[in-house]
Amino acid sequence: MKKYKHFKGGIYEWVCSATLESDPNIQMIVYRAANGTIWTRPGSVFFEEVEHQGQKVPRFALIESSIN
């Protein structure tokens, strides 16, 4: 299981990656919030750096990675 911390503080669990049907070149990341809500966003956005408090930081930073 992989867990990521969003730059605003939320913790999310990686569910899977998927190919967008309408454009097979786009990899979508599927992830779950602590309250169970499922979210998805393009991999290019999930893994990008954003500006936060004057610094470039990852949108999602890996905080836990384990093999089940």
Task: Report each predicted region and the residues it spans.
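Mixed-charge, low-complexity intrinsically disordered regions
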Residues: M1-N68
